[in-house]
A protein has these predicted regions:
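Extended, low-polarity transmembrane helix blocks
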Residues: 1-49, 65-76, 80, 87-207
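Perimembrane loop-to-helix junctions flanking transmembrane segments
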Residues: 52-66
């Protein structure tokens, strides 16, 4: 144990010297999430009537109660949440409704489709739905190879089937959860400079 402690101390000292850069990870998380949330929110706001119909219709939509309110909350949370993430303002607070939005999306929209966003029968996370998609994809390829410009169609990437599982929603939730605990990050966020100005949270690694 003494040898382990002796070896640990200098290594920990090196890590402590790197603490000045501990705001980099929160910054990159924010820059990754901000355009995703902004785009999702803007799509809902710019097609608000269609969004409300999808939220409320029980046959081909989500069948949620109070669809106007739910659509407005989801769209506003994503769009304005994306703006706050971008500038690093109230990041820990806005992470909460954004996480709730991701949970609602995962449970009400994506859960029945399993984990995978893109159907990949070779994945060990593939469910029965994904395995069945392999035959559909093979038939689609055969039709396009026989009757379409297959080389041109696949010139920018392979044909895939969207499975629409919880993969993206769960990933965004984990990233937001990290921001909830770490904050917006040192030096590159409005939160950090507000904390310094007010004397609140200045002793934490990330504001």
């Amino acid at each position: 144990m003494n040898r382990l402690t002796t070896a640990y101390r200098p290594l920990q000292g090196i890590l402590q010297q790197l603490q000045w850069g501990d705001g980099l990870a929160p910054l990159l998380l924010r820059l990754y999430l901000a355009p995703v949330m902004l785009q999702a929110g803007w799509n809902k706001l710019s097609h608000f009537e269609e969004t409300v119909a999808w939220f409320g219709n029980p046959e081909w939509g989500l069948g949620l109660p109070l669809p106007e309110l739910m659509a407005a909350l989801a769209a506003g949370t994503e769009f304005f949440g994306g703006l706050l993430l971008l500038i690093g303002l109230a990041v820990r607070w806005i992470s909460i409704p954004l996480m709730i939005t991701m949970l609602v999306a995962a449970l009400s929209v994506h859960l029945d489709n399993g984990w995978l966003a893109i159907a990949d029968p070779s994945s060990w996370l593939a469910n029965e739905r994904v395995m069945e998609s392999a035959e559909r994809l093979a038939r689609a390829r055969a039709l396009l190879q026989a009757h379409g410009h297959y080389d041109w169609l696949t010139g920018r990437g392979s044909l895939v089937i969207l499975n629409n599982g919880i993969e993206f929603a769960a990933t965004y939730f984990v990233m937001l959860l990290s921001l909830f605990f770490t904050g917006a990050g040192r030096f590159t966020s409005v939160d950090y400079w507000l904390a310094r100005r007010t004397g609140l949270g200045v002793h934490t690694p990330s504001a």
